[in-house]
Amino acid sequence: KIKTMKYLSFNIDNINAGKILFDFYEKTGDGRYKVAMDTLRKQLAEQPRTSEGGFWHKLIYPHQMWLDGIFMASPYLAQYGNVFKDTTVNADIMNQIKLIARKTYDPKTGLFYHGWDESKTQNWANKETGCSPNFWSRSIGWYAAAVVDVLDYMPAQFEGRDSIMTIINTLAEGIVKYQEPETGVWWQVTDQNNRKGNYLESSASSLFVYFLCKAVNKGYIPVEYKAAAERGFNGLIKQFIKEEPDGSYTITNCCAVAGLGGKGNRDGSFAYYIGCLLYTSDA
């Protein structure tokens, strides 16, 4: 049991923070950490799913998969399976990654929409595809980071690996396509460039740089992407890192939060995403 966890909310955001428990358990052997890890694993075993097995984002967001959710759950599940020799998780992880790619990928832009509603009933959902209407950079960054992170815990060869490599290379191509040429970083709404109100956003840019660097280092994408990764890293420092008078540093232009549906007018529109609060040193 995790004392403050609202288990029956089936909030997939609960899972990601559990990754730190593996280190605590390894270093201390304290069984309480194992109980907490098992609790998170149990949530995923019981998580409501779409008809094709995709995790709902939360119980209050029925029939919906968001790109965010792949990052929140899949790396944890992959590490759990690796540490505790639970190979049953591998096929599930591959299904999550490939399913949301099929449902949210837009071949016209080379990008992935933020969310998908299987029921196609949400106010933000396209009535034909179920997709949300725009490309939120941080959600794409979360998805990209998740895909390269899960491979750390998967067997060297597994069924579906070629499909995952295709997704990684598709992500890299789309991300670099929309890299802002002067600064090397990325916009809050990925494909809207200099549209009035759009802004360069630090958390998404950081995730994109992380993904590109790791994918190049692991050999998942061609080494030619290294130049884009370096431009992005240098851009992060120049655009977003601010030294304070006391010698500390802050990261600027962090979108506080964005989602779909629920409370407020979270309709996935361009106006919604650019209207999200900006924080410093928070994402």
Residue ranges and their predicted role:
Residues 80-88, 150-161, 218-222:
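Inter-helical turn/loop segments and adjacent helix faces that build the functional surface
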Residues 279-283:
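Conserved small/polar residues in nucleotide/adenosyl-binding loops
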Residues 144, 150-190:
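Oxyanion-binding "anion nests"
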Residues 15-24, 55-69, 110-136, 183-204, ...:
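Carbohydrate-binding/catalytic loop surfaces
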Residues 1-7, 35-54, 90-123, 165-183, ...:
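Long, well-ordered core segments of solenoidal/helical folds
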Residues 20, 29-72:
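Extracytoplasmic mature domains of secreted/periplasmic and thylakoid-lumen proteins
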Residues 201-218:
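Internal helical hairpin/lid segments
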